[in-house]
């Protein structure tokens, strides 16, 4: 029988906020255990540092500019070849539980209108999912005009009004959006707990002998920065390392304008040491809860006798800046934003490996197909990285990412950012000598040839 696939997809998980990645404080014993029995990749880029383009790229293995999805404005096409459709054709039952973010209605309901999340299930299924249970970002739950499986669950427990009141206080892009808070809900009613419970039920109620490809898509640790009471208390007195709050250098007028957008998004006027420290505490708590719930799902698989026949793949759509360079969230090409965790564990486990080759999330697309004995979807640019479980791989020469009219790329030594409107380079960092990306070399005379070479390669990528 073909192996099962558990594809765990977090939202906005920064690449180094795991014990196995060397973080000195965060508690992630289950992710660490997966890494101890598999391979952890240290240089994985998402194809866009924002939700929808990244997710479009993951399911197709194609780049955002090819799909015409370069921002969070929708545009997903059910006719796209996807890895889920390929796996269905290879005999798999496919299921997604959590956030997909495929459709344009993934926005707050307009005045007078209502949205029931379940009305979108047919659209999501058309991408190759047999079973769909979808949820929204927490901040969209603030609207009383929105109904989701989770809001109904909270209503049944008499806690929906309490929850909505707190989420409204931290509604998107206000200063409170980034203020660390403790949830008014007990841990067992948290959204991550709900999604893990739904996953447990799905696994136990399956009535087919087909192998499964199950995507468990957590909504956390995406903002708002609200952790459950248990983990919030755990990190309350932890010694938090707050990064220097120095803003990026505005090297060109176009880049200066975009940095102003990022600054406004991050509400930088609120960003002093204590404010950022409080936010990081809650972020660590959300990561630890996701890890805890992963452990519960793995325990269910073990109880059902399925763990030793299941590949586990863990990653995220993009990262989180956590105050670094005086920014929150993503939407830029700093490592904190564009690099994501990637861990792959084979059935039964394998000796732990760390893989430093350059890898993209398009490679995850090809890898999922490879696990299931299927061909990658048509147009997929990914390369399967299954071989990395056993030995070093060559990896890629270049990595690419794009959001709107800005694009980033890197090779083994340098990272470049370019404004596509006027084709001007904005950033160049030496990733080996300056891993903190503190010294922008883009306007140095000694960098001119390298900037031109990388810029030409980036333009060629975008026009191929």
Where would I find each of the regions flagged by the language model?
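Short, well-ordered alpha-helical segments
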Residues: 429
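Residues forming the ATP-binding cleft of Hanks-type serine/threonine protein kinase domains
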Residues: 432
């Amino acid at each position: 029988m073909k192996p099962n696939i558990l594809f765990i997809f977090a939202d906005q998980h920064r690449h180094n906020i795991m014990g196995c990645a060397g973080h000195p404080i965060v508690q992630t014993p289950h992710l660490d255990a997966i890494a101890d029995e598999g391979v952890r990749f240290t240089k994985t880029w998402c194809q866009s540092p924002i939700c929808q383009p990244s997710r479009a790229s993951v399911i197709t293995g194609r780049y955002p500019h090819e799909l015409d999805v370069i921002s969070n404005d929708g545009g997903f096409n059910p006719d796209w070849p996807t890895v889920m459709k390929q796996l269905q054709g290879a005999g798999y039952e496919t299921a997604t539980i959590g956030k997909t973010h495929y459709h344009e209605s993934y926005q707050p309901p307009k005045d007078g209108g209502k949205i029931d999340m379940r009305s979108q299930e047919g659209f999501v299924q058309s991408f190759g999912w047999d079973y769909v249970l979808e949820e929204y970002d927490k901040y969209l739950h603030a609207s009383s005009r929105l109904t989701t499986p989770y809001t109904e669950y909270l209503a049944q427990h008499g806690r929906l009004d309490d929850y909505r009141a707190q989420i409204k206080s931290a509604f998107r892009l206000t200063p409170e959006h980034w203020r660390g808070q403790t949830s008014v809900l007990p841990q067992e009613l948290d959204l991550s707990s709900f999604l893990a419970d739904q996953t447990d039920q799905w696994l136990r109620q399956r009535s087919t002998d087909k192998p499964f490809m199950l995507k468990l898509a957590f909504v956390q640790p995406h903002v708002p920065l609200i952790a459950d009471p248990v983990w919030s208390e755990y990190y309350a007195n932890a010694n938090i390392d707050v990064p220097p709050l120095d803003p990026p250098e505005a090297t060109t007028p176009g880049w200066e304008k975009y940095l102003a957008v990022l600054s406004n998004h991050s509400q930088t006027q609120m960003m002093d040491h204590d404010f950022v420290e409080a936010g990081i505490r809650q972020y660590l708590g959300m990561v630890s809860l996701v890890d805890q719930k992963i452990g519960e799902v793995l325990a269910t698989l073990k109880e059902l006798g399925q763990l030793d026949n299941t590949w586990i793949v863990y990653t995220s759509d993009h990262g989180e800046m956590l105050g670094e360079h005086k920014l929150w969230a993503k939407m830029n090409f700093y490592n904190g934003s564009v690099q994501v965790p990637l861990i792959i564990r084979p059935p039964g486990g394998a000796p732990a490996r760390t893989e430093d080759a350059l890898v993209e999330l398009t490679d995850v697309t090809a890898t999922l197909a490879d696990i299931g004995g299927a061909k990658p979807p048509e147009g997929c640019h990914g390369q399967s990285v299954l071989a990395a479980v056993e030995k070093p791989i060559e990896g890629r020469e270049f990595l690419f990412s794009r959001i709107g009219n800005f694009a980033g790329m890197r090779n083994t030594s340098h990272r470049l950012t370019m404004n596509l409107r006027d084709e001007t380079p904005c950033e160049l960092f030496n990733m080996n000598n300056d891993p903190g990306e503190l010294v922008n070399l883009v306007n140095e005379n000694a960098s001119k040839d390298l900037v031109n070479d990388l810029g030409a390669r980036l333009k060629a990528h975008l026009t191929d």
